[in-house]
């Protein structure tokens, strides 16, 4: 604050850092010039943002906020009229802690908050290594924040808002150079460097800390996905989507009609369609509102695409990078420039006045800093990231409060987005169709380790995309119906939604029947398909592949989905880890032909299924409790 660093509470004087003995407590001393503890309060958890649920896209009604308690510690300084509160949230039935700080200025004038560190957590080292290492193993925790950007996975958190650091006090560690990363610090890489006027309050971003009880990868992945469903439950909304390639009125109406016929739930006027979210003219708003009303009359949600980052807008409105640095995507406007303010004004206006339900926000804000001193929304470099992030976070929170679905190719889940890319390479759609089938399943298999099925979208261009010609293209759909059905089975069988991009979903009665078959399959088993995935065998083209869907709270507690890429049927004995289904007694096994069998799990919590998977086909097996 105003150039001086202050500790918030805390004691010092511990003789060694390897362990702590209670008898040392009496000899510890406060940090000099620190804020001092005043009081502690316990409250019910309050929602950090308003969420208008879309139950038609959810298989389970998730509570909001997540049940638990908030604990607030208040600290004051003997010489400053500044109050600091340290907030914790603890949740029912989860080893998860959330933490953030708030600062209230009671001075007669403004203060400047240059930086903050909202968490300093000394942890037991994950490994005890004498020698130098390039890639250290970190303590067994999952860390998330709502200040994370610049990529589709949470790994970017180390570049935005947290760090694992060495502890200079830990002189008794094994590592010769004292380089073991044992201290978690939560702090922005820049700023915030903001002015806090008299009576104003500053609130930091939040961190969530999930403590794992095992290094078993499946168990850790389950724990992480459960945490995300609890603290960002809008990720469980999983609408069935189509990307219509043209935003012309009749093209959009055709897409809406076809979606309604086969059970799709959402139409997105995609990139390159001609939809312009920045056109807030009365004529455009009137036309789009007419399309929205038409879609709603058919039970279909409608919205469109807007590009934010990776574009150059000129006029002094682009980010000004320090020497030697470039924007994340080569070009980017500054969100706090004159253009940025007008851009968001237009988005608010067109979504308010048309009632659109979905925004596909490409690039989003990737965290680019800006050294300009001419932009109206920030002072210079040090506050530029913080101020730009506030703009995007406030907009996404508004979208959540309005029930506007957010497809964002960035990791904004905890700030309000619903879905990001599952993980794929776009140029793979120029490969022959038969190659795409297995690669698609690999992408789903890998992506659902770290995401729930509803958190990641896949992409299926029905028309030519990135080249490849006829061999790579699904249109005409009726001419490539077996391949089209495999793609439907790949994705609906995984509970993963794709953006099916083209002018139509079907072009013949037989095509329509196949699409409806798999939509009906997903809707019939939505609760289990939206549940967690236990990975059985990764696709490699050499044998069967598949996974086990689990939902311990549902009637259908398990759904085994198996695929055969070979040109001959395969008979296999497959171990199924039914432990994860929560079934305690006998297991009712329902085979694809309707045959019922009862089985008991072994001492490892598994059953053995003797399966016959047809050539170049798939099967699913349902598991229930007797």
What role is predicted for each listed range?
Residues 1-181, 190-192, 585-597, 609:
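Polysaccharide-binding surfaces and accessory modules of carbohydrate-active proteins
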Residues 27-51, 210-224, 287-328, 352, ...:
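Glycine-rich, aromatic-flanked loop segments that form ligand/cofactor-binding clefts
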Residues 37, 194-212, 614-624:
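Short Pro-Gly-centered flexible turn/kink motifs
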Residues 217-266, 270-273:
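An acidic-aromatic substrate-binding cleft motif
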Residues 238-249, 270-285, 325-344, 376-388, ...:
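The substrate-binding groove and active-site-proximal loops of carbohydrate-active enzymes
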Residues 248, 288-293, 297, 301-356, ...:
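Active-site-adjacent "subsite" loops/lids of carbohydrate-active enzymes
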Residues 392-595, 608-612:
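Active-site-proximal substrate-binding groove within the catalytic cores of carbohydrate-active enzymes
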Residues 600-626:
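C-terminal beta-strand-rich structural cap/linker in extracellular carbohydrate-active enzymes
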């Amino acid at each position: 604050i105003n150039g001086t660093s202050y500790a918030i509470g805390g004691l010092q004087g511990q003789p060694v850092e390897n362990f702590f003995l209670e008898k040392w407590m009496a000899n510890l001393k406060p940090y000099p010039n620190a804020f001092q503890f005043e009081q502690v309060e316990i409250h019910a958890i309050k929602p950090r943002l308003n969420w208008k649920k879309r139950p038609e896209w959810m298989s389970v009604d998730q509570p909001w906020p997540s049940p638990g308690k908030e604990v607030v510690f208040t600290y004051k300084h003997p010489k400053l009229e500044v109050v600091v509160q340290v907030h914790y949230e603890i949740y029912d039935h989860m080893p998860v802690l959330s933490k953030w700080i708030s600062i209230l200025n009671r001075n007669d004038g403004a203060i400047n908050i240059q930086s903050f560190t909202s968490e300093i957590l000394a942890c037991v080292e994950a490994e005890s290594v004498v020698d130098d290492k390039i890639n250290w193993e970190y303590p067994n925790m999952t860390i998330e924040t709502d200040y994370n950007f610049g990529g589709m996975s949470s790994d970017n958190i180390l570049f935005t808002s947290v760090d694992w650091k060495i502890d200079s006090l830990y002189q008794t560690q094994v590592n010769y150079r004292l380089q073991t990363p044992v201290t978690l610090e939560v702090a922005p890489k820049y700023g915030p460097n903001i002015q806090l006027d008299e009576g104003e309050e500053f609130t930091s971003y939040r961190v969530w800390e999930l403590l794992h009880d095992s290094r078993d990868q499946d168990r850790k992945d389950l724990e992480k996905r459960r945490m995300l469903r609890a603290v960002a439950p809008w990720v469980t909304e999983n609408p069935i989507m189509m990307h219509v390639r043209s935003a012309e009125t009749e093209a959009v109406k055709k897409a809406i009609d076809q979606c309604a016929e086969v059970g799709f739930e959402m139409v997105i006027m995609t990139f390159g369609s001609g939809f312009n979210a920045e056109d807030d003219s009365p004529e455009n708003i009137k036309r789009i509102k007419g399309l929205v009303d038409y879609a709603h009359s058919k039970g279909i949600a409608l919205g469109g695409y807007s590009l934010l980052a990776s574009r150059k807008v000129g006029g002094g409105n682009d980010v000004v990078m320090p020497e030697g640095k470039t924007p994340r995507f080569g070009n980017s406007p500054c969100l706090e420039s004159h253009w940025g303010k007008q851009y968001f004004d237009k988005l608010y206006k067109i979504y308010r006045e048309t009632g659109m339900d979905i925004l596909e926000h490409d690039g989003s804000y990737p965290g680019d800093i800006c050294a300009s001193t001419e932009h109206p929304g920030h002072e210079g470099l040090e506050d530029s990231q913080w101020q730009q992030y506030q703009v995007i976070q406030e907009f996404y929170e508004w979208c959540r409060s309005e029930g506007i679905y957010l497809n964002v190719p960035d990791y904004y889940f905890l700030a309000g987005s619903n879905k990001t890319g599952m993980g794929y390479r776009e140029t793979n759609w120029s490969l022959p169709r038969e190659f795409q089938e297995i690669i698609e399943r690999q992408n789903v298999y890998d992506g659902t380790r770290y995401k729930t099925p509803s958190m990641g979208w896949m992409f299926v261009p029905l028309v030519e995309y990135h080249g490849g010609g006829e061999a790579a293209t699904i249109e005409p759909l009726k001419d490539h119906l077996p391949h089209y059905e495999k793609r439907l089975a790949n994705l609906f069988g995984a509970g993963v939604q794709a953006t099916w991009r083209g002018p139509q979903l079907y072009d013949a009665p037989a095509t329509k029947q196949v699409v409806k078959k798999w939509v009906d399959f997903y809707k019939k088993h939505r609760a289990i398909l939206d549940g967690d995935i236990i990975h059985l065998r990764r696709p490699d083209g050499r044998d069967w592949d598949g996974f086990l869907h689990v939902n311990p709270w549902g009637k259908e507690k398990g759904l085994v989905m198996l695929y055969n890429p070979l040109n001959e049927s395969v008979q296999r004995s497959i171990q199924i880890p039914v432990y994860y289904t929560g079934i305690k007694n006998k297991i009712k096994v329902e085979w694809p032909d309707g045959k019922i069998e009862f089985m008991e799990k072994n001492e490892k919590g598994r059953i053995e299924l003797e399966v016959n998977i047809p050539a170049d086909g798939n099967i699913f097996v349902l598991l229930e409790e007797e």
